[in-house]
Amino acid sequence: MRKPTALIILDGFGLREETYGNAVAQAKKPNFDGYWNKFPHTTLTACGEAVGLPEGQMGNSEVGHLNIGAGRIVYQSLTRVNVAIREGEFDKNETFQSAIKSVKEKGTALHLFGLLSDGGVHSHMNHMFALLRLAAKEGVEKVYIHAFLDGRDVGPKTAQSYIDATNEVMKETGVGQFATISGRYYSMDRDKRWDRVEKCYRAMVNGEGPTYKSAEECVEDSYANGIYDEFVLPSVIVNEDNTPVATINDDDAVIFYNFRPDRAIQIARVFTNEDFREFDRGEKVPHIPEFVCMTHFSETVDGYVAFKPMNLDNTLGEVVAQAGLKQLRIAETEKYPHVTFFFSGGREAEFPGEERILINSPKVATYDLKPEMSIYEVTDALVNEIENDKHDVIILNFANCDMVGHSGMMEPTIKAVEATDECLGKVVEAILAKDGVALITADHGNADEELTSEGEPMTAHTTNPVPFIVTKNDVELREGGILGDIAPTMLTLLGVEQPKEMTGKTIIK
């Protein structure tokens, strides 16, 4: 008889003391409450930096399953760069250092370009400020900024505040000048509208386009003509004698500080592809030996990468497979990619000894119409698998609290919680009957907050903690755990050694 170790993820099941608008608290859930009272339990943080997101940002299913399966904090790009700056690793980055060394040796210029805002979707201006401070520290004299104005991830007329903030940092560091200004409509096209990108390229390389004495003047003039941040024409900042402050020339270096690839690829290709054919770049095609991209943009961009992709080796699924154990991943359609692709660290293929069961989600317009979704079918299939002694490790996702929770409707969400509790009982009893152990948790909150304080539907995820129960009375659990600690805890229970790549810490004392 196999003694299964099962991870039961109650998707969207957060914990909050306040009962108002809280479907989790208002639902009748004798099984969950019984396990909470009977077995060792604690709560885990499932949002913000604990899961690799910016501080205070709610978690989501993709990030949650990625962290749980990886057994470590998987930093998203924005947070990864923020942490590198905070911990002093940013300045030591070899790719940045190589670009700086190149321009110092050749007496050439360093150009910084990217989206100038604090939107945090494609870029963050703090990353550019860190580059200005690094250039100043390393004694780079010629530093030029090619600012892409936002107006989309932030307010439509906010550019001036970001220009002011940049001026402050340039004043503080003694380095940097604005060279070109352009709305993201031109510089960050992703739909192969190359005529837009060409305008931006010609401003940066040839100094072609409307000219202004300052970035402020450019923005003021655009506003006067009814053109706001996103759509500002690629413009050139000029000196008193009307010559461009800077153009991009041979042997200059570029650091493109956008971290999200999709809208960075086209403009990067113009500068890095020797055989670029989308438009005629003209006589002057600067040779840039050091073109640095903040993250990996695309195979089509021939640049250096400052923050290389994180390879998630030795995820829980891989370690379990290497130990020769049989594992099952089971969910209904809505959460199937989460227990497979995301849980395996972005890997589609199954590991040796891995089996997958997909139960179709019901075909309804919205899940509040059928709060139980396909949970009974998922449960029946799983209980059958457990009774047949087929698997050592089980990864199960119950989707209801999240998918129905997104409706912001109390009654259906309470029903979803109650159906989840009923099926949780069936699964846990089947596991205990085999002398197995269940770990009951969630990837983030949702059903725990269905109404705003004004009584409006609250459809988003929450930042509340999630439960963690181990159905085994001879263990003690510590406080302060995170989702990345679950896999190490499972390995402890399985008696399998934790690999060094898994930096999470077991929750068992």
Swiss-Prot record:
The keyword tRNA processing does not apply. It catalyses: (2R)-2-phosphoglycerate = (2R)-3-phosphoglycerate. GO terms for biological process: glucose catabolic process; glycolytic process; sporulation resulting in formation of a cellular spore. The modification Phosphotyrosine is found at Y35. It comes from the Bacteria. SUPFAM superfamilies: 2,3-Bisphosphoglycerate-independent phosphoglycerate mutase, substrate-binding domain, Alkaline phosphatase-like. HAMAP family: GpmI. Monomer. This is 2,3-bisphosphoglycerate-independent phosphoglycerate mutase. It comes from Bacillus thuringiensis (strain Al Hakam).
